[in-house]
Amino acid sequence: MEILKDYLLHICFILFPILLYQVFWLGKPAILVPKINSGLVTLFACGASVLCIIFPIHEMDYIQYGLQMIPVIICLFYISTASGLTVAASVLCFELLFYEPSAMFVFTLLPFLIIIPILFQKKWPFMSKAKKLLLSLLISCVEIFLFFASSWILSALNILNFQKSGIFVYEAAVSGLFRSSVLLLSIYIIESIAENIALRSQLIHSEKMTIVSELAASVAHEVRNPLTVVRGFVQLLFNDETLQNKSSADYKKLVLSELDRAQGIITNYLDMAKQQLYEKEVFDLSALIKETSSLMVSYANYKSVTVEAETEPDLLIYGDATKLKQAVINLMKNSIEAVPHGKGMIHISAKRNGHTIMINITDNGVGMTDHQMQKLGEPYYSLKTNGTGLGLTVTFSIIEHHHGTISFNSSFQKGTTVTIKLPADLPH
């Protein structure tokens, strides 16, 4: 019964910081998934590891058993190498200061346990939940094997002496199984929390889009008809005789340009109101990306911006090619307008990743702050002086209608990367 109490205590040490972080940091309502607070996660992970060392599960031949390595693995996968190494260093220092025999095992296992997460660190965010759990199980098996191997090596060198080898093997196996189970449980909970947060963000965005679409449907048609009449009478008003005056010609140009801008805004409203009008078919996304890039080259040249396109061949996808093309154009246009004149670089790529097709649009523009990224996609929010924000709102709707996701990774004055993920599965 005592050992069961120790096991439950260690489970609390590992899972409580995860749930605490979810409540205080990820529980904030936001359209986009909140950015990970690396410092806070690292602090929680260090605390969890130290508690596992202070309150070990049991002792045998002066060896402490615990779950102190699990926060290291979690930080390496979900935060960064620096975060994982910080937690690992805190574990090793605490072991050396207070539990020297255990530090021998930590020092032996640590390099091997760190290498595997670092090797898969870049691929980890794009793995499915099943693959992540499978990789975590592999790491646990490697840890158990290395633990047994280092135990016998240290015993053979008379550094540590295990008097009851049978009991040691049994307890080490039970401890290894327990560590594997808690690591898998932790990964599963983290992935479930991430899925729920993403779903919540989509629901918040969908509610806002529904309100805007209803408004667009009721207002757009009523406004478009008077604008058409106004445009016709403006052209009649500024006849050939009137246009001989230079100021009159400038007035006509200004009035017509503003009417065209109003017409464009109404068109965007109608695009949101007609989200049900999608003509889906199987098409080659790589060809669409190349075609869209070619169309945007002239606009980019006007802004002295270089556009590069890189796509894998035969990226077949099921969707509305016209709508997706509009979404890509909107994003590329925003990128071109965000980069400095004469020094701009836009790179668009498309590739398959399992059952997902990823489109990345990267620029070296002015970038965005976290607050600005949180508001992207909201109607009427724009980073441009004369912008309405409707173009990006329409883009969000198009991606959402194709059961995809769109995310932004940006640093102020360093550039932005837009990532679109679309399902690659074709209808049977």
Swiss-Prot record:
Residues spanning the membrane: 7-27, 38-58, 69-89, 100-120, 133-153, 167-187
Residue stretches making up the Histidine kinase domain: 218-426
Cytoplasmic membrane side: 1-6, 59-68, 121-132, 188-428
Source organism, top-level taxon: Bacteria
Membrane topology term: Multi-pass membrane protein
GO biological process terms on file: positive regulation of sporulation resulting in formation of a cellular spore; sporulation resulting in formation of a cellular spore
Residue intervals annotated with topology Extracellular: 28-37, 90-99, 154-166
Classification via Pfam families: HATPase_c, HisKA
InterPro entries the record matches: HATPase_C_sf, His_kinase_dom, HisK_dim/P_dom, HisK_dim/P_sf, Sig_transdc_His_kin-like_C
Disulfide bridge partners, by residue number: none
Keywords carried by this UniProt record: ATP-binding, Cell membrane, Kinase, Membrane, Nucleotide-binding, Phosphoprotein, Sporulation, Transferase, Transmembrane, Transmembrane helix, Two-component regulatory system
One example GO MF annotation: ATP binding
EC numbers, comma separated: 2.7.13.3
Any one Gene Ontology cellular component term annotated for this protein: plasma membrane
Catalytic activity: ATP + protein L-histidine = ADP + protein N-phospho-L-histidine
Chief localization: membrane
Subcellular compartments: Cell membrane
Residue numbers bearing the Phosphohistidine modification: H221
Job of this protein: Phosphorylates the sporulation-regulatory proteins spo0A and spo0F. Spo0F is required for the KinB activity.
Protein name listed in UniProt: Sporulation kinase B
